[in-house]
Design a protein with these regions (language model features):
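Short glycine/acidic-rich loop motifs that flank beta-strands on beta-rich extracellular proteins
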Residues: 1, 16-22, 43-49, 66-72, ...
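Surface-exposed loop/turn motifs in large extracellular/passenger domains
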Residues: 1-8, 23-35, 51-58, 75-88
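Acidic, glycine-anchored loop motifs typical of Ca2+
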Residues: 98-116
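Juxtamembrane amphipathic/hinge helix adjacent to a transmembrane helix
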Residues: 104-110, 135-171
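Juxtamembrane/start-of-transmembrane alpha-helix segments at the extracytoplasmic/lumenal side
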Residues: 165-189
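Alpha-helical transmembrane segments
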Residues: 189-202
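Cytoplasmic C-terminal tails of single-pass
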Residues: 201-219
Length: 219
């Protein structure tokens, strides 16, 4: 529960939920701003109660989260702002287009997958994410609009590109010398074990000696 909160330029990667909003902001006429954040490879990018309102999202990147946005139970997140001053967010599963090349999609981004709506009500169903059953349900909702659930999120100005936060982009990815030394040692041990298995050393091995008896010629 917070007020006067601004969450900017964070990288949230590989968590159960990138951000969870319960009752923020608390006071009326207060807006919480999420700007320039990087939510990637989480189970859920942003999760909130359906009653949550007045949260503004601008310039965030939602990258390959199993579920980009989720409500806890029935409802939606439409009482929040998913674009500010004509600038929305980047969504990795957005399939729209940018006809005028301004970097903003001409088609709104919507979170309205049938299987995701079911998992919001029945979380245990997430075990079947990416299963043939979940894909079939989503395909059926696309083919038959009457099955399509109400959207939970509508971003009217989705971004076509995203920017990696500076503190991630500048991370030195060059392997250290100690890492290389340990790797070479492990490779050497692995090679020695392989050769020993392929050509085992036989100890105390003696070749059999064959003896031949000779009989003298009888006179």
């Amino acid at each position: 529960d917070s007020n006067y909160l601004s969450v900017e330029n964070n990288a949230v990667i590989g968590n159960q939920s990138g951000v969870y909003i319960d009752n923020s902001p608390m006071l009326p006429d207060i807006i919480t701003l999420f700007k320039g954040n990087f939510f990637a490879y989480n189970d859920v990018g942003v999760s909130a109660l359906p009653s949550v309102a007045r949260n503004a999202f601008q310039g965030n990147a939602f990258i390959d989260n199993l579920q980009q946005a989720s409500t806890l139970g029935r409802g939606n997140l439409l009482k929040n702002m998913w674009q500010v001053d004509g600038v929305g967010n980047y969504w990795s599963d957005y399939v729209g287009y940018d006809s005028d090349g301004d970097g903003i999609g001409n088609v709104s981004y919507r979170v309205e997958k049938l299987f995701e709506s079911l998992t919001d009500e029945y979380p245990l169903l997430r075990l079947f994410t990416y299963s043939p059953a979940s894909q079939s349900l989503n395909f059926a909702a696309v083919a038959f609009p009457s099955l399509r659930p109400d959207p939970k999120v509508i971003d009217e100005a989705p971004l076509m590109h995203y920017t990696i936060p500076a503190h991630i982009a500048q991370t030195d990815s060059t392997p250290s010398m100690s890492f290389l030394v340990v790797s070479l040692i492990l490779l050497g041990l692995g090679g020695a074990i392989f050769l020993f298995t392929l050509y085992p050393i036989r100890l105390n091995h003696t070749a059999p000696i064959t003896t031949h008896e000779t009989q003298g010629a009888k006179s």
